[in-house]
Each structure stands twice: as structure tokens, then as C-alpha cells.
Amino acid sequence: SAASDVYKRQLIPKCVYTNPEIASIGKNLEQAKKAGIKAKSIKVPFKAIGKAIIEDVTQSKGFCEMVVNKDDDEIIGLNMIGPHVTELINEISLLQFMNGSSLELGLTTHAHPSLSEVVMELGLKANGQAIHV
């Protein structure tokens, strides 16, 4: 069926509602390499994001790590621990569904200051254009 063609288990966000929150989608670096993918990992700490600092100093704990295919810039996975990551993961879910690249993520305009800038920063860092790290 068409629904099963669209459904991909790897594209389902996994969320843990603890303090801090944890969220992931897709493969981590080890899983990508085991699958024979030439992958790289990019990490951005929340302490680099202004909104995380001005909202509450405890919000600046944690990080986001993106796994990207070196050959075609495809976002293979994302792991996050920190403030509101169970909300932030949805942007990556949509981007993966639409076969978006890390560059497209980085060039997407995000409100400033906002926690979602962490994923924009990941996309920029993956392409050597980071602003905050």
C-alpha cells in the first residue's frame, strides 16, 4: 500500500520525557558505519545557543549531535539531550521525510533567539559555516 511505502521505522522520533529530555531519530554514527555509510558526526552544545542561556542557566546543559552522509549530505540521524528536544526533533523528522540535506537545514531561517537555532547551527557546522561554535 502507499501508506507502507511512506512509513519508515527509522524516521519515527524516539523521545524520553525526563529532565533533561532526550530525543533521537534515524541512525547514530556507529549504526551508520555498520550499514556501510561514510558518515560524520557534528555536535553543538546548547550553551552555544543564546535562548538556552537567557531562559534559564540549566537550559544550557546538553547537546545535539547530527549524523550526516559524507557522500551526499543526507541527514542520517540526530541525537539530542537538553531543553525541549522532544519538540525540536520534529523539524528533523520532516527534513528526513523530505530528503533534506544538512545544508538546507543550516540555511533555513530560524527565529532569534530560539532553542531551534541549535539545529540550524548543526546544519551550518556540517558545512563549515557555523556561527556560534
Regions found by a protein language model. Give the residues of each.
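Short, small-residue-biased leader/transition segments that mark boundaries at the very start
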Residues: S1-Y7
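N-terminal periplasmic "start-of-domain" segments of outer-membrane beta-barrel proteins
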Residues: K8-Y17
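Flexible, glycine-rich terminal cap/loop adjacent to redox cofactors
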Residues: T18-N28, K33-V133
